[in-house]
């Protein structure tokens, strides 16, 4: 069957912060850009980012990008690439002021400058006292960012395809990515989007876990598309568990609460973080705080509740006025999902899957990388990745709060700037044969033809339970090996799952089944990677290997999809403008 073809200079898949920032840059340069999103752009998951954008503006105290870089490298447990971290921290202020000029409604200090709040893992002067570096728009910073970028994309005539679901990348015989096939959810029409550059900006995949702060759309579509196209994924064992998800609901409670002066309590009313991180206390790195809460619970000091043991986040001492001006969204979320009024009593919280530090390895310019036989980096022609799906890697083994929005804006912009030049240089569109395009429809055809078999909902539930039980905050070799075997069985079950709804118009079950394929690819890569790394570093914490092992593991892990095997990739320790930060013991 010959598909209808739409041609563009670039196609961006995903309309969150990174995708919209990249699309904006491409459209501003006069190139044609298609922006595909399976939801309306302002409903992308960036909208849930609450706390702010960490950037060294120096509005509340003297600050400097090198201090920010030090904190980020330390936060990453030293497997963040220092050239990329340097680029992000150095260009951050410029990228944020551009947003301000686009009309992003930041909260303000009395003198009119952008308000900045303290966040976890921030310090002055390379590990000195607590810094306030996170620029915020109340506790709705992601919401403000998305609306600003959406309006700018409309103004600059980006062609937006809302409620289109990308099926798979189209690769030609030369191994170049030449666009993607996508399904219009409203009509069921399938179109081949042919492009000189394809940018994956599909976001995270927290839905591989049972309990997550992520939206239902975070299904790892980009990870699945990359793996099926033979592109490796990096550091997939590194999943951040946010210390404060509402117990029982998984809804995020921003770190900004602790930045404003909130703190955690156990069932004895003790402020327990003082024991685990005597200096930073409740504003230690997220992996440290999440583990501390889990240890309190394991040792019997968790608070009891209908959702099981949890910790309490105390905010009432801040007063109604501060909460209403600085954290209005949190008041609303707590009242709705925890049935608690934070003005009067603490919020029940538990560590909840939040962020994927791993993803497609890329250069600072967003160009996707693979490795050749000699283990050298090679660019995948025509493919780019930005945002949470990319592993540049500025976050390493643990992301600092507020750095994700910075990552979106800085690297979305960087990919767009690179594409302005590279698209012009490339000349004619690369071609794909009809069989190349057909190959990208294999999954869709499989689901459309599977009328008998198991209910996919049961398979998804089994996958999420397996991940939650075996690959959570604390991990252990035997449990992870067992988890991997379970996933192999679940993967076989998935091949024989059925699609009940055969309609073409607004068939949400078909989309959910296609998403389940991507969840499976993501979960499997995570499990293999987690079994591979025999140490504890950042978010990857093992009972059987409790120590960090720099001699063997100061490196990225790389999952190779063709062989389903693992290899190592070295960390970049060569920033351009200053000496590298050598690995040290990480204390807060």
From Swiss-Prot:
Sites where the protein binds FAD: 14-19, 37-52, 221, 388, 404-405
Residue(s) carrying Tele-8alpha-FAD histidine: 45
Family from the record: Belongs to the FAD-dependent oxidoreductase 2 family. FRD/SDH subfamily.
EC code(s) of this entry: 1.3.5.1
Outcome following mutation: residue 187 to M: No recovery of protein cross-linked to SdhE, SdhA is flavinylated
Functional note: Two distinct, membrane-bound, FAD-containing enzymes are responsible for the catalysis of fumarate and succinate interconversion; the fumarate reductase is used in anaerobic growth, and the succinate dehydrogenase is used in aerobic growth.
Name used for this protein in its record: Succinate dehydrogenase flavoprotein subunit
Keyword annotations of the record: Acetylation, Cell inner membrane, Cell membrane, Electron transport, FAD, Flavoprotein, Membrane, Oxidoreductase, Transport, Tricarboxylic acid cycle
Catalytic activity reported: a quinone + succinate = fumarate + a quinol
Disruption-associated phenotype: No effect on anaerobic growth on glycerol fumarate medium.
Lineage: Bacteria, Pseudomonadati, Pseudomonadota, Gammaproteobacteria, Enterobacterales
Keyword Hydrolase assigned: no
Membrane topology designation: Peripheral membrane protein
Entry cofactors: FAD
SUPFAM superfamilies: FAD/NAD(P)-binding domain (SSF51905), Succinate dehydrogenase/fumarate reductase flavoprotein C-terminal domain (SSF46977), Succinate dehydrogenase/fumarate reductase flavoprotein, catalytic domain (SSF56425)
Enzyme class, UniProt record, top EC level: oxidoreductase
Native organism: Escherichia coli (strain K12)
GO cellular component: membrane; plasma membrane; respiratory chain complex II (succinate dehydrogenase)
The keyword GTP-binding is annotated on this UniProt entry: no
Catalytic site positions: 286 (proton acceptor)
GO terms, biological process: aerobic electron transport chain; aerobic respiration; anaerobic respiration; tricarboxylic acid cycle
Gene name of the encoded protein: sdhA
Sample GO molecular function, one term: flavin adenine dinucleotide binding
UniProt pathway annotation: Carbohydrate metabolism; tricarboxylic acid cycle; fumarate from succinate (bacterial route): step 1/1
Residues that, per the record, bind substrate: 242, 254, 354, 399
InterPro entries with a match to the protein in the record: FAD-dep_OxRdtase_2_FAD-bd (IPR003953), FAD/NAD-bd_sf (IPR036188), FRD_SDH_FAD_BS (IPR003952), Fum_R/Succ_DH_flav-like_C_sf (IPR037099), Fum_Rdtase/Succ_DH_flav-like_C (IPR015939), SdhA/FrdA/AprA (IPR030664), Succ_DH/fumarate_Rdtase_cat_sf (IPR027477), Succ_DH_flav_su_fwd (IPR011281)
Quaternary context: Part of an enzyme complex containing four subunits: a flavoprotein, an iron-sulfur, cytochrome b-556, and a hydrophobic anchor protein. The complex forms trimers. Can be cross-linked to SdhE.
Localization per record: Cell inner membrane
Gene3D superfamilies documented for this protein: FAD/NAD(P)-binding domain (3.50.50.60), Fumarate reductase/succinate dehydrogenase flavoprotein-like, C-terminal domain (1.20.58.100), succinate dehydrogenase protein domain (4.10.80.40), Succinate dehydrogenase/fumarate reductase flavoprotein, catalytic domain (3.90.700.10)
